[in-house]
């Protein structure tokens, strides 16, 4: 892409041009010593990596890449905050690939992600960018065969991307050897360091060599996370976007007032034709609700697919494959989908339930406007949700209007 290099999956999306001025509006609250490197050619990257970057379809680094890649390559600990769809994944992937010694068939970089799908996507992106480097990269995730993990790790992997539980398990079994690890990347750190993953990350961290470089990347960095970074980062460089900038421009946000829960379903059915203009994701807060809504939609003869964390890994993979290819157009999901999964053609998000915490809101709707294309987010709001909606508006300094009749024209 000309203005932003974002880890996309379809060729056309990669080539999509963003206007130059779109990037200049992004304000960074950044450590003073961070300079801007405007092209990939001037970053001092190895030749075979540059080939991979251009072959992937990237042309010009995005704002976060212009600032972060050079610092990571220098060996600095980095806290990078950037909006969804601005190329965060490519930022650390390019940096990791640059720092590898390909002759040494040992794990030199470890990337932790909160979901299996995100870990697999990171692995695929690394293999694509490192296509000319002969890089070995394995996704170490729960729900897959442990024996296969052990076999792959014994063969030797330069980079391991994975979920904290399985990665720690592999370290404990001594299948994943940590002695050569130079860099730890925490992707979607706000989610990772939330209660569920905090302990596991510390467990993994204790096994790493003392001089390991730490890179932490996320869309939102609440205060308590910045406090935690003090524990395992040394004099980190900060590359931060002002929070006001965090709701993506180009995403129109609306609400539909529904007096009670039962009315949400009728509203969704009325909107179905609008949903299928491109592709849509519908978010519910619980797995049970996802299953219930999927069944109810199918009973009413609407075609939908669904995904949540309790489904077997294989099933989730095939659902994602269908959705990416466009074979399925409407996906009902829990927040497992909200983090970092690129499907360029999604331009409509529906919050059937408002998210349980306001941090999640940006992860959900930050999907629909990726690559600078316009997107629409529609929030179903019961009477007792009005307070939550106002809180979200205030938190992100944004405005959420009542949905107009002609919403289909906006997609």
Swiss-Prot record:
PROSITE patterns: DEAD_ATP_HELICASE, HELICASE_ATP_BIND_1, HELICASE_CTER, Q_MOTIF
A Pfam family this chain is assigned to: Helicase_C
InterPro entries for the chain: DEAD/DEAH_box_helicase_dom (IPR011545), Helicase_ATP-bd (IPR014001), Helicase_C-like (IPR001650), P-loop_NTPase (IPR027417), RNA-helicase_DEAD-box_CS (IPR000629), RNA_helicase_DEAD_Q_motif (IPR014014)
UniProt KW keywords: Acetylation, ATP-binding, Cytoplasm, Helicase, Hydrolase, Isopeptide bond, mRNA processing, mRNA splicing, mRNA transport, Nonsense-mediated mRNA decay, Nucleotide-binding, Nucleus, Phosphoprotein, RNA-binding, rRNA processing, Spliceosome, Translation regulation, Transport, Ubl conjugation
Enzyme Commission number(s) of this protein: 3.6.4.13
Tissue: Expressed in the CA1 field and dentate gyrus of the hippocampus (at protein level).
Record text on activity regulation: The ATPase activity is increased some 4-fold in the presence of RNA.
Motif stretch (DEAD box): 187-190
rRNA processing found in the keyword field: yes
Example of a GO cellular component annotation carried by this entry: postsynapse
Protein name as it appears in the record: Eukaryotic initiation factor 4A-III
Annotated source species: Rattus norvegicus (Rat)
């Amino acid at each position: 892409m000309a203005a932003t290099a974002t880890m996309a999956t379809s060729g056309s999306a990669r080539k999509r041009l963003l206007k130059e001025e779109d990037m200049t509006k992004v304000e960074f609250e950044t450590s003073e010593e961070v300079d801007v490197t405007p092209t990939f050619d001037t970053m001092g990257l190895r030749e075979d990596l540059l080939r991979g970057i251009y072959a992937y379809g990237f042309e010009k680094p995005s704002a976060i890449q212009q600032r972060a890649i050079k610092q990571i390559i220098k060996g600095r600990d980095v806290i990078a905050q950037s909006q969804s769809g601005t190329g965060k994944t490519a930022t650390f992937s390019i940096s990791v690939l640059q720092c590898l010694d390909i002759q040494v068939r040992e794990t030199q970089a470890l990337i932790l992600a909160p979901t299996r799908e995100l870990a697999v996507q990171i692995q695929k992106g690394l293999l694509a960018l490192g296509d000319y480097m002969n890089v070995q990269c394995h996704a170490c995730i729960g729900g897959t065969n442990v024996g296969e993990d052990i076999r792959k790790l014994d063969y030797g992997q330069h980079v391991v991307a994975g979920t904290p539980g399985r990665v720690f398990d592999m370290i404990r079994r001594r299948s994943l050897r940590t002695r050569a690890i130079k860099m730890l990347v925490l992707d979607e750190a706000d989610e990772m360091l939330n209660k569920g993953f905090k302990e596991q990350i510390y467990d993994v961290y204790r096994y790493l060599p003392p001089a390991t470089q730490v890179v932490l990347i996320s869309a939102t960095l609440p205060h308590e996370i910045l406090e935690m970074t003090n524990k395992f980062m040394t004099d980190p460089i900060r590359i931060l976007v002002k929070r006001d900038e965090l709701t993506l421009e180009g995403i129109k946000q609306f609400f539909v007032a529904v007096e009670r829960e039962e009315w949400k379903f009728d509203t969704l059915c009325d909107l179905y034709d609008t949903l299928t203009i491109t592709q849509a994701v519908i978010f519910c807060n619980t797995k049970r609700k996802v299953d219930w809504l999927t069944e109810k939609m199918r009973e009413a003869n609407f075609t939908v697919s669904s995904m949540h964390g309790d489904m077997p890994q294989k099933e989730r993979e095939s659902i994602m494959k269908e959705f990416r290819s466009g074979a399925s157009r409407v996906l009902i999901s829990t927040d497992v989908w909200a983090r970092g999964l690129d499907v360029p053609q999604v331009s409509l998000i529906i919050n059937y339930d408002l998210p349980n915490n306001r941090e999640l809101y940006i992860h959900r709707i930050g999907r629909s406007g990726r690559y600078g294309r316009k997107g629409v987010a529609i929030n179903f709001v019961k009477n007792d949700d009005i307070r939550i909606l106002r809180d979200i508006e205030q938190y992100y300094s944004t405005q959420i209007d009542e949905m107009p009749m002609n919403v289909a024209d906006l997609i």
